[in-house]
Amino acid sequence: MIRACVAGLLIITCVAACGAPEQEAHFVRLGPETLPDESFEKLPEKQLQPGSLIIYPENMTSFYDHPGEAGFFAFGKEYGFDSLSFVITETHPHGGPPLHTHSVEEAHVLLSGTMEYVVGEQRFKAKAPYIARVPAGVPHAFVNAGDSPLNLIGVLPTKDPDYQPVGPNPLIEAVDAE
C-alpha cells in the first residue's frame, strides 16, 4: 500500500510539473559549502525522535561521492518505513556517483535540470521534470549535464537497500570533454 501511495504521489508530482509552464525550480543546498577532495559518509547530526513523521536532513546520514555529489540517505529500517528508503542529492555540474548497482529497482525524481545517464548498455540524457526507472541489479551512473547544481531524489522499495560500487563513473570524462 505504501509503495502504491508513493508511486502515485511521484506520478502526480511529475504529471503536474510536466503540464505546468516551464519555471525555474529552487535548488536546495544540501552538501558542504566547499566540495571535499575525498568521498565520505557521516552519521546524522541529530537522532530522529521516536514517532516523528518528518525526517529532516540533519536526521539522515550524509555522504559525498567524489566528484560532485553530496546528499543524505534514509534507510527505511532506521526511520520506521516497512518497504522504502530514500536518497536526496545535491549534484554539481559534471558530478555524479560511481557506477554502481542495487539489488532492488530504483526510481529517480528530478524536478529541474538535465542528467545524463548510463543504465546497463544504454546512455541517454533526460531533461526534468521526470521519473527515471533503474532496474534491479543493473549497473548505472549519472552526471549533472547542466551548468548549475540540482537536487535528485532516489526512491528504493526496501527498508534496507544495498549499494555496490562497480567502477568509476564512465560519464565524468565524457561530460568534461564536451
Language model features with spans:
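Bacterial N-terminal signal peptides that target proteins for export
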Residues: M1-V6
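C-terminal motif of bacterial Sec signal peptides marking the signal peptidase cleavage site
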Residues: V15-A17
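A short, N-terminal "cap"/entry segment at the start of jelly-roll beta-barrel domains
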Residues: G19-S83, G167-E178
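Conserved short histidine dyad/triad with adjacent acidic residue
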Residues: G71-F72, V87-T101
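Short, charged/polar surface micro-motifs in flexible loops or helix N-caps
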Residues: G80-D82, H92-H94, T114
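Glycine- and acidic-residue-biased ligand/ion/polar-headgroup-sensing regions
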Residues: V104-E106, L110-M115, G120
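Short acidic-glycine-tyrosine-enriched beta hairpin
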Residues: E121-A136
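Ligand-binding loop in jelly-roll beta-barrel domains
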Residues: A136-D162
